[in-house]
């Protein structure tokens, strides 16, 4: 902090009240540190790094396309697509419909088809049914990590038809 004796290194651009840095009536005690929950992650094998789900809608069905990546236990900064290497890692996908029906896809699926899906609609237009997606990562057939999210099956379109003033978008 060039030119200031009352600021700590790294706190030059922090948004705090000036008095917290000791120039006024208080001590030189900027409130900094851990202020949200902290989690320590331990593992004996790799873990799921990310799951990307892309939806493809057709008449009477929705196909979910999965892209699952994992972190190896040796280097958590590295990301490896699951199923692209013969390293013993596979994943299984279970989708639970709003009515409780389960659809299971094993052996590192890239796609999963939902027949007669219940679509998610904006508030006031229809219902908002959610599907629970569970991805289980396994090493040599033994589960090592699980990822769970709830998703809505929906499409979005932009109405660009001309009206009396021009196009709406």
Where are these regions (language model features)?
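Secreted/periplasmic carbohydrate-active enzymes, especially glycoside hydrolases
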Residues: 1-169
């Amino acid at each position: 902090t060039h030119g200031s004796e009352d600021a700590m290194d790294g706190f030059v651009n922090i948004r705090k009240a000036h008095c917290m840095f000791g120039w006024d009536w208080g001590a030189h005690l900027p409130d900094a540190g851990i202020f949200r929950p902290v989690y320590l992650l331990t593992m004996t094998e790799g873990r799921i790094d990310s799951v990307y789900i892309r939806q493809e809608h057709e008449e009477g069905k929705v196909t979910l396309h999965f892209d699952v990546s994992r972190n190896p236990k040796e280097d958590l900064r590295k990301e490896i697509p699951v199923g692209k290497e013969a390293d013993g890692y596979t994943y299984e996908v279970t989708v639970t419909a709003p009515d409780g029906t389960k659809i299971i896809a094993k052996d590192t699926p890239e796609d999963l088809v939902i027949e007669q899906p219940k679509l998610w609609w904006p508030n006031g237009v229809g219902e908002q049914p959610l599907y629970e997606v569970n991805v289980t990562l396994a090493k040599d057939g033994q589960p090592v990590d699980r990822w769970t999210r709830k998703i809505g099956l929906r499409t979005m379109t932009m109405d660009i038809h001309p009206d009396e003033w021009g196009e709406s978008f």
